[in-house]
């Protein structure tokens, strides 16, 4: 099946089935992430309480854990929900926001990797390098490395964790430790809208909920981000307009638009 057709088939399943995607995310992006998942066709649930998160995770199609604001309850919720998801066979996606920047974030990322069996990890190059134990430069949550620089670390991390790893950037790199795919598309203006990386992680969760091939599902989610970002940026005055238009584009995205807006290479 052509790549765009495979992406759209998964997107159609999301739109038809509205999988429950449980998010334990940061307090900067909660509303934006929920709206993006709704535009995609998924059903978002946003939670921070450990007991609540664990119960929801057991019912979910996927669990998304984002450590952007690593407060105590958030982290305990991620660990509790991760355990419940693992017990129920629910895929878990981890977004290690600014993983190597502070000792607190290094500690939280380490606990997640040690405690929860992950289906996928999505981060920028600095975050993936930090998770892999390599030196990385970052400015807060922003990477100071190109995504391709982190490709070898992503492969090693995918092998050690037994999961799919996505390094997002101007070119997205997705690997399961054996296969490596690059996805180009999107628009530079996307870096001026806070939370679109978190949206990408949430989209990975939605695609994992409908496709048991987690490598393919991650590629498909990033293709939707690339195609929608490119279309949303066309003709807008700036990032404020892009943020609004992105939801509209995702809501009505077609197979032809995916084919035109996301370029894949192995």
From Swiss-Prot:
Reactions that this protein is recorded to catalyse: 5-(2-hydroxyethyl)-4-methylthiazole + ATP = 4-methyl-5-(2-phosphooxyethyl)-thiazole + ADP + H(+)
Q: Does the keyword Magnesium apply?
A: yes
Which cofactor(s) does the record list?
A: Mg(2+)
A Pfam family recorded for this sequence: HK
Might you name a Gene Ontology BP term for this protein? thiamine diphosphate biosynthetic process
Give binding positions for substrate. Answer: 46, 195
Q: Which GO terms describe its molecular function?
A: ATP binding; hydroxyethylthiazole kinase activity; magnesium ion binding
Print the keywords alphabetically: ATP-binding, Kinase, Magnesium, Metal-binding, Nucleotide-binding, Thiamine biosynthesis, Transferase
- Could you tell me the EC number(s) of this protein? 2.7.1.50
Q: Which Gene3D superfamilies match?
A: 3.40.1190.20
Associated pathway: Cofactor biosynthesis; thiamine diphosphate biosynthesis; 4-methyl-5-(2-phosphoethyl)-thiazole from 5-(2-hydroxyethyl)-4-methylthiazole: step 1/1
Q: Which InterPro entries match?
A: Hyethyz_kinase, Ribokinase-like
Which positions does UniProt annotate for ATP binding? 122, 168
Broad class of enzyme this protein falls into:
transferase
Could you say which protein family the record assigns here? Belongs to the Thz kinase family.
* Name of this protein: Hydroxyethylthiazole kinase
Please name the source species.
Solidesulfovibrio magneticus (strain ATCC 700980 / DSM 13731 / RS-1)
What does the record give as the organism's lineage? Bacteria, Pseudomonadati, Thermodesulfobacteriota, Desulfovibrionia, Desulfovibrionales
């Amino acid at each position: 099946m052509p790549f765009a057709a495979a992406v759209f088939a998964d997107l159609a399943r999301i739109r038809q089935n509205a999988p429950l995607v449980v998010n334990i995310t940061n307090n900067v992006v909660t509303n934006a992430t929920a709206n993006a998942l709704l535009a995609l066709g998924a059903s978002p649930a946003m939670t921070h309480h450990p007991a609540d998160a664990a119960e929801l995770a057991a019912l979910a199609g996927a669990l998304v854990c984002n450590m952007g604001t690593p407060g105590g309850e958030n982290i305990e919720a991620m660990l509790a929900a991760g355990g419940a998801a693992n017990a129920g066979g629910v895929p878990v996606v981890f977004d290690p926001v600014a993983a190597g920047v502070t000792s607190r974030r290094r500690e939280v990322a380490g606990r997640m990797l040690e405690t929860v069996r992950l289906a996928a990890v999505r981060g920028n190059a600095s975050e993936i390098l930090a998770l892999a134990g390599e030196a990385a430069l970052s400015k807060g949550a922003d990477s100071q490395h190109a995504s391709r620089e982190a490709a070898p670390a992503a492969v090693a991390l995918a092998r050690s964790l037994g999961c799919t790893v996505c390094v997002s950037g101007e070119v997205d790199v997705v690997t399961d430790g054996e296969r490596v795919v690059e996805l180009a598309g999107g628009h530079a203006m996307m870096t001026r809208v806070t939370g679109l990386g978190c949206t990408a992680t949430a989209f990975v969760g939605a695609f994992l909920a409908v496709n048991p091939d987690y490598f393919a599902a991650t590629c498909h989610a990033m293709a939707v981000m690339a195609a929608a970002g490119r279309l949303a940026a066309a003709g807008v005055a700036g990032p404020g307009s892009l943020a609004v238009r992105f939801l509209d584009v995702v809501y009505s995205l077609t197979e032809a638009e995916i084919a035109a807006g996301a370029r894949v290479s192995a």
